[in-house]
Amino acid sequence: MKQQIRLSDHFTYRKLLQFVFPSIIMMIFTSIYGVVDGLFVSNFAGKTAFAAINLVMPFIMVLGGIGFMIGTGGTALVSKTLGEGRQEEANRYFSMMILFTALLGVLLSVTGVVFMRPVALFLGATPEMLEDCVRYGRIVNAFTAAFMLQNVFQSFLIAAEKPKLGLAATVAAGVTNMALDALFVAGFRWGIAGAAVATGLSQCVGGLFPLVYFLRPNSSRLRLVRTRLELRPLLNACGNGSSELMSNISSSIVSMLYNFQLLKYIGEDGVSAYGVLMYVQFIFIAIDIGYSIGCAPIVGFHYGAQNHAELKNMLKKSVLLMCASGAVLTVLASVLAAPLAKLFVGYDEGLYTLTCHAFRLFSFAFLFAGFNIFASSFFTALGNGLISAAISFLRTLVFQTASVLILPLIFDVDDIWYAITVAEVFATLISVIFLFAKRKKYHYMECSPHGKK
């Protein structure tokens, strides 16, 4: 019988990739939700409905980001507590995070449904797009609690040493989404509403399946126990995981700015082309995010156990893997630009040509993105939410916003597609500076004789 990989193990490249592989696949399937919606809506409901989804997606992703914030910050706290040998307290923290997520999800769901129309108008919905924006946004927001729970469990299942269970739940949700999209959008011709219902029901599968698992007797490292909400650990988790929320909010703001700029300079086709780029980026970046989510509990555990040698091992291997991943993804993005554009917008020759061109310019961003995502996640796992948030804030809100606004003014309008790449280069410099600045505090660049084996 194959031996289960434990957080306390020493990780070789093979063992590390085996442990994080379910998380990577899990994130890819999660990203497929929006991609499949966009694919079916674009081909069966038209480019106006497709543009409407792209316009409201930033708002929806902010709500999902809150789940990631609680999940990553809470997992760092729970993993560190496990590393310190305090099992009962780890279970209490875990249960507290799940309860808080469920209650907050219901509140945000109601708020999103009620205020979807003014939100769509604020995001710049044209009269032609408005009703589609409101319809899609309200239906998807009705499932916010399940969406947030799904994002939270993605992190906690890894800390519970059950990454394959997380993968199974996410694959089940992804298959549900694709099957229902085919049925509701292509079969019943429900249009944008069918895509929204398919997404919402798939999120229920991804969020409620792990909840049922933890409510029953199980063999994982974590248990749901009776608990009450406590301000200090909740603030600790939310503060530490704030970089994930910051990243989602900032990315959403950048997407809004991109849409505004593209509507101004290129028109509705620019928004649709950007939508295709974002969908493909979701899948590509999911590889880096999945890796970072997968190794974060390992980092948190060994930080709690004061095993400095293993921290150094994790950092070295992760940096090399992220560099290799960036090179491969950049080449793939360039090679697959035409077939992927054809898949989404092949019905419109002008839009197809624009999307292919934009895709090739945009692809260089993947060279640097993985390293920056890992650096932010690494500091979250170490309990330093401030630096993690700073990397995310500068990478997305500051550098990307500045690039989107300034590049078309200084250079050609075409250079707006380079904005993300320029931002990632500056973010890489910041990440390297922070890693070197904090090396003595966390000892991840030295083999400490005091580290435990």
Predicted regions and their residues:
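Small-residue-rich hydrophobic transmembrane alpha-helices
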Residues: 50-110, 147-166, 273-337, 369-391
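Short alpha-helical transmembrane segments in multi-pass integral membrane proteins
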Residues: 1-20, 78-145, 176, 187-242, ...
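Transmembrane helical elements of multi-pass membrane transporters/channels
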Residues: 18-37, 139, 173, 202-206, ...
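Residue-level signal for transmembrane alpha-helical positions in Major Facilitator Superfamily
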Residues: 17, 33, 70, 111-115, ...
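N-terminal transmembrane alpha-helices
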Residues: 8-45, 58-73, 77, 81, ...
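Transmembrane alpha-helix boundary and packing residues in multipass membrane permease domains
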Residues: 23, 27, 39, 76, ...
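Helix-terminus/linker motif at the lipid-water interface of multi-pass membrane proteins
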Residues: 32-50, 120-127, 183-190, 252-283, ...
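Short runs within selected transmembrane alpha-helices of multi-pass transporters and secretion channels
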Residues: 71, 139-158, 169-177, 195-208, ...
